[in-house]
Amino acid sequence: MKNCDKITDIVRSTTKNQRNPIIRIIRVQAMELKYEQITHKIIGASFEVHNFLGNGFQEVIYQRALAYELTQAGLSFEREIEQHIYYKNLPHPIGKRRADFVVEHKVLVELKATIQLEDVHLAQALNYLKVYKLDVGLLINFGSKSLTFKRLIRSIT
């Protein structure tokens, strides 16, 4: 990863019992995001889908439209690859799951079509990153009036 100059952000926050805001200075080390070009194209394709279809459709409609847009963007992908889930030393899987997309064999994409993303959606996508052994993912929600997304990074523990 390439390091850039340090950036200073000023964050103002208040608590219920305070009248004056607390000003904190946060130094952020700006750096190139892993697979930034791929995720940028995926997000752009997602905006194209949302701008055309809007919200209110079932998730599968957005999956099909996004598959078309990813192809138009020149990205290779696989849809709903089945992945087995193992527990400890058990020799057989205890279950299986399918992520919506794996793009360029590097970025997991999980779609939702709900009014707002919930913690359970985030937990699901993070678990998929672990199961698929991928470092970067996008959780994209088409269900609200504006497209929303979260960029996910698998923590290595």
For each feature predicted by the language model, list its residue ranges.
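Accessory recognition modules or surfaces
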Residues: 33-43, 47, 88-99
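Arginine/glycine-rich "motif VI" loop of SF2 helicases in the C-terminal RecA-like domain
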Residues: 129-135
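Active-site metal-binding core of divalent-cation-utilizing nuclease and nuclease-like domains
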Residues: 58, 63-106, 114-117, 139, ...
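Nuclease catalytic cores
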Residues: 35-40, 44, 55-59, 63, ...
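Electrostatic, structured charged patches in enzyme active sites and in nucleic-acid/phosphate-binding
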Residues: 51
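Conserved SAM-binding loop
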Residues: 111
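Domain-level recognition of nuclease-like catalytic cores that cleave nucleotide substrates
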Residues: 1-37, 121-122, 136-157
